[in-house]
């Protein structure tokens, strides 16, 4: 929450405002109200790949010391700044990363030619390079594979921001848990 480099529009939260982070985690008793889905966790790949992806490191906390029957994963995306105001986090409404994904998807929807495929691939690879250490750009040769990669990236990039349901519905995909 400290960096505002990619924020286009946000709802700033100040001391005295409600804390969005409190909806996900409570300090008292370490109650995890919302644990990340295994489907989302699996999208980040192996434990080595997870460690290289800044989103996993900042969105999801793993604690192997939690008792049996308790989720070892917790959402930490909205824990807020490090100055003692836990859970007080600005709400990012539009970010550069989302714009890259929108443009990549739009390029493929407008045209199915090599230029659109190249432009969409570049947007996706640029976003991933900004998020993943040691990222190696991927080459996409067909629209369907690239669109699926964009949808998967939206799932990770926009986790806990309220986009997933609408992404599934606008694509007529099943809403499954």
For each feature predicted by the language model, list its residue ranges.
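Short, cationic low-complexity segments
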Residues: 31-45, 50
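Acidic/polar-rich alpha-helix caps and helix-coil junctions
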Residues: 1-25, 46-177
């Amino acid at each position: 929450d400290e960096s505002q480099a990619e924020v286009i529009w946000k709802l700033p939260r100040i001391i005295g405002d409600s804390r969005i982070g409190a909806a996900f985690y409570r300090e008292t008793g370490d109650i995890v109200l919302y644990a990340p889905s295994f489907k989302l966790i699996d999208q980040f790949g192996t434990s080595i790949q997870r460690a290289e992806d800044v989103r996993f490191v900042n969105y999801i906390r793993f604690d192997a010391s939690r008792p049996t029957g308790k989720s070892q994963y917790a959402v930490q995306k909205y824990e807020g700044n490090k100055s003692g105001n836990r859970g007080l986090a600005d709400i990012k409404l539009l970010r550069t990363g989302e714009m890259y994904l929108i443009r990549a998807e739009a390029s493929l929807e407008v045209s199915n030619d090599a230029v659109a495929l190249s432009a969409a691939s570049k947007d996706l690879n640029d976003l991933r390079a900004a998020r993943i250490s040691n990222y190696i750009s991927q080459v996409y040769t067909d629209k369907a594979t690239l669109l699926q990669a964009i949808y998967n990236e939206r799932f990770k990039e926009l986790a806990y921001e309220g986009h997933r349901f609408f992404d599934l519905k606008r694509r007529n995909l099943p809403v499954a848990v």
